[in-house]
From Swiss-Prot:
Something else known: The presence of selenolate in the active site is essential for resistance to overoxidation: in the absence of reducing equivalents, the enzyme can form a selenylamide intermediate during its catalytic cycle, thereby preventing its irreversible overoxidation.
SUPFAM superfamilies in the cross-refs: Thioredoxin-like
GO CC entries: cytosol; mitochondrial inner membrane; mitochondrion; nuclear envelope; nucleus; protein-containing complex
Reactions catalysed according to its record: a hydroperoxy polyunsaturated fatty acid + 2 glutathione = a hydroxy polyunsaturated fatty acid + glutathione disulfide + H2O; 2 glutathione + H2O2 = glutathione disulfide + 2 H2O; tert-butyl hydroperoxide + 2 glutathione = tert-butanol + glutathione disulfide + H2O; cumene hydroperoxide + 2 glutathione = 2-phenylpropan-2-ol + glutathione disulfide + H2O
Gene: Gpx4
UniProt GO MF annotations: glutathione peroxidase activity; identical protein binding; phospholipid-hydroperoxide glutathione peroxidase activity; selenium binding
Protein name, as recorded: Phospholipid hydroperoxide glutathione peroxidase GPX4
Disruption phenotype: Embryonic lethality in utero at midgestation, caused by inability to initiate gastrulation and the absence of embryonic cavities. Conditional knockout mice lacking Gpx4 in spermatocytes causes sperm abnormalities and male infertility. Conditional knockout mice lacking Gpx4 in photoreceptor cells causes retinal degeneration, decreased mitochondrial biomass and decreased number of connecting cilia in these cells. Mice display neurodegeneration.
One BP term from GO: chromatin organization
Length: 197
C-alpha cells in the first residue's frame, strides 16, 4: 500500500482520535468534513450575526436551545416572543439560546444578516443570533448535520429539518437530549428544562 493511500485512510481515524482526546475536544472545532467525529456541540464553531467566528465551546456548562429562525414565517411571532420570554426567565439559571436564520423553507428569511439583526431587535432579542446558514443538504452547517443524526436528534419521517423553528435541546455537556418539531412552540420546552438546568 502506498504512503499516500495509507495517509488518506488514516486521516479520519487520527482526526477522530484527536477530537476524542481529553483536553483537545474543547480546543478543536469540527469542520465541514469531520462533523461525524464530534462528540458534543462544543466541538463546533459558527459565525455570529456580525460575522465573527465563535467556538461553541463557550456554551460548555450551559443548557442550550438551538433553533433555525425565519422573519417571514407564520410561526415567527409566537416563536420569537416565547424564545425571548424563556431567555428572560431562565438565562440566570444557565439557559442559552442560539438562533440560526435559514432561508431554505419558503424563502422566508431573505434578508441580509444586518436586516435579520434589526428584525430581531424589534423583539428585544438578547439571546445569541448567528449568521444565516443552510440546515439541510450538502451545504448544511456541520453543527446541524451533527445534531440531526444524534440518537435524540433524529426526526420523524427522516432526519431532515422539515420547516422553520425546529428546536434542539442541548445539555450542559453539549449533547442533544431532545428535538422539537416546527409546530411545537418554545413554551413546550419549558417542562423539560428543570431536568437539565
Amino acid at each position: 500500500m502506498s504512503w499516500g493511500r495509507l495517509s488518506r485512510l488514516l486521516k479520519p481515524a487520527l482526526l477522530c482520535g484527536a477530537l476524542a482526546a481529553p483536553g483537545l475536544a474543547g480546543t478543536m472545532c469540527a469542520s465541514r468534513d469531520d462533523w461525524r467525529c464530534a462528540r458534543s456541540m462544543h466541538e463546533f464553531s459558527a459565525k455570529d450575526i456580525d460575522g465573527h467566528m465563535v467556538c461553541l465551546d463557550k456554551y460548555r456548562g450551559f443548557v442550550c436551545i438551538v433553533t433555525n429562525v425565519a422573519s417571514q414565517u407564520g410561526k415567527t411571532d409566537v416563536n420569537y416572543t416565547q424564545l425571548v420570554d424563556l431567555h428572560a426567565r431562565y438565562a440566570e439559571c444557565g439557559l442559552r439560546i442560539l438562533a440560526f436564520p435559514c432561508n431554505q423553507f419558503g424563502r422566508q428569511e431573505p434578508g441580509s444578516n444586518q436586516e435579520i439583526k434589526e428584525f430581531a431587535a424589534g423583539y428585544n432579542v438578547k439571546f445569541d443570533m448567528y449568521s444565516k446558514i443552510c440546515v439541510n443538504g450538502d451545504d448544511a452547517h456541520p453543527l446541524w448535520k451533527w445534531m440531526k443524526v444524534q440518537p435524540k436528534g433524529r426526526g420523524m419521517l427522516g432526519n431532515a429539518i422539515k420547516w422553520n423553528f425546529t428546536k434542539f435541546l442541548i445539555d450542559k455537556n453539549g449533547c442533544v437530549v431532545k428535538r422539537y418539531g416546527p409546530m411545537e412552540e418554545p413554551q413546550v420546552i419549558e417542562k423539560d428544562l428543570p431536568c437539565y438546568l
